[in-house]
Amino acid sequence: MSPPAATFDIPVANTGNGLSLKKDLAVKPAASGVAKSLAEIEHNWEKFTFAPIRESQVSRAMTRRYFNDLDTYAESDVVIIGAGSCGLSAAYTLASKRPDLKIAMVEAGVAPGGGAWLGGQLFSAMVMRKPAELFLNEIGVPYEDEGDFVVVKHAALFTSTLMSKVLNFPNVKLFNATAVEDLITRPAPTSNDPNAVRIAGVVTNWTLVSMHHDDQSCMDPNTINAPLIISTTGHDGPFGAFSVKRLVSMQQLPQLGGMRGLDMRTAEDAIVKRTREVVPGLIVGGMELSEVDGANRMGPTFGAMVLSGVKAAEEAIGVWDERKAQNDE
């Protein structure tokens, strides 16, 4: 039996183009404009005009929806940090299998997709080793079969297709240009570690604000509570490997293993197999995991990122009920 779909107390738009739009606000029908199809506009540009609008309508249309999303997702079921190929794959898999869960994605960049807009060295083609082509079949991305691996003609085709599918789920919200600055914790002492914690949410801020804490003062953050976090922030960098570096500074991990040199043959298997809940409430996947375990990097091949995301979603489904019960205590 499939789980019930997530429900939100937000009115659905009563007008539009007939396509299924997610949790929109009620809007008024257009006051003018008689064209019923694009074909009626073509070759008739002399009489063309847009429907009337005031600038305040645009402001309200954006802010009303955004702040409703902030309110709705302040208590989420799962937060995914990072919307690269691993995070997007995790979101797709999780939203597909558990439509009852509210999933918030937090991405520091303006453009989601991470490094998956291009292949290696800014080339266009994207390579995935088999059996990652099964995920491409799932989302409908064409490829050329090269035997043991497949090639997507342009990485942007994969990323844009996956992103459009993720954003069309009614239970997923992407907060891009938003950085995770910290993790929310709760005491979870064990017999071996009386100072152990579980992760219970994320601390967020606008990315542009996060980048200027050194030259501006008193810019406090916001928060999202969730019983389970999936962190896919990539290898070490300005925003990369954020969650695992924070675990070290909180003394929840002894130290990072440090990503090793490039070895495609060992790296991809290691990343997928080791994708797991590192501490209670925090699942780590993708290249961020290489910094924990000291795994090799795989370079310009993307199959491990995709299948690590799939496994992260599977791990999340496996522990979510337990983490939710703990979160409700």
UniProtKB/Swiss-Prot annotation:
Q: What is its main location?
A: cytoplasm
Residues modified as 2,3-didehydroalanine (Cys): 218
The record lists the catalysed reaction(s) as: [ADP-thiazole synthase]-L-cysteine + glycine + NAD(+) = [ADP-thiazole synthase]-dehydroalanine + ADP-5-ethyl-4-methylthiazole-2-carboxylate + nicotinamide + 3 H2O + 2 H(+)
Which keywords fit this entry according to its UniProt record? Answer: Cytoplasm, Iron, Metal-binding, NAD, Nucleus, Thiamine biosynthesis, Transferase
In short, the EC number is 2.4.2.60
Q: Which InterPro entries match?
A: FAD/NAD-bd_sf, Sti35, Thi4_fam
| This protein's GO CC annotations | cytosol; nucleus
GO biological-process terms attached to the record? mitochondrial genome maintenance; thiamine biosynthetic process; thiazole biosynthetic process
Q: Write down how the cofactor binds this protein.
A: Binds 1 Fe cation per subunit.
Cite a single Pfam family from the UniProt record. Answer: Thi4
Gene3D superfamilies named among the record's database cross-references: 6.10.250.2840, FAD/NAD(P)-binding domain
Q: Which GO terms describe its molecular function?
A: cysteine-dependent adenosine diphosphate thiazole synthase activity; ferrous iron binding; iron ion binding
Which residues are involved in binding substrate? 86, 107-108, 115, 180, 220, 235, 287, 297-299
**Family statement drawn from the similarity comment of this UniProt entry:** Belongs to the THI4 family.
Q: How does it assemble?
A: Homooctamer.
Against NCBIfam families, the record matches this protein to: sulfide-dependent adenosine diphosphate thiazole synthase (TIGR00292)
Q: What does this protein do?
A: Involved in biosynthesis of the thiamine precursor thiazole. Catalyzes the conversion of NAD and glycine to adenosine diphosphate 5-(2-hydroxyethyl)-4-methylthiazole-2-carboxylic acid (ADT), an adenylated thiazole intermediate. The reaction includes an iron-dependent sulfide transfer from a conserved cysteine residue of the protein to a thiazole intermediate. The enzyme can only undergo a single turnover, which suggests it is a suicide enzyme. May have additional roles in adaptation to various stress conditions and in DNA damage tolerance.
- Output this protein's name: Thiamine thiazole synthase
Q: Which organism is it from?
A: Phaeosphaeria nodorum (strain SN15 / ATCC MYA-4574 / FGSC 10173) (Glume blotch fungus)
Q: What is the lineage of its organism?
A: Eukaryota, Fungi, Dikarya, Ascomycota, Pezizomycotina
